Amino acid sequence: MAVLDYVLGEERSRLKRYQSHLEEDAAGLPKGSISIKIKSNHPYAYLTFREGGRVISKYIGHAESPAVSELSVKIGDRRRIVKELQAVKAELRRIERMLRV
């Protein structure tokens, strides 16, 4: 049983390091989504996100600009990281339960 406890402890510490790494990565990326609004037959992009209890729309630029596509990639990266972070947290809870038994 000592070997199993050791392996689970090592996996727990590895997952905690990975969790902090993912949290740092997610903190550096924008959250929210891009919404397109049409004014005078011209599409404009806005970054829409929540701050506190309010919904904020921040102007990015023309919908076809490179800044919009770059921001879209960053938002996609953040969503992927957050999904991975949820999986890591679930695995940590599972390991914690195994160590308690």
Model-identified regions with their sequence ranges:
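A positively charged, amphipathic N-terminal helix/segment that binds anionic biomolecules
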Residues: 1-101
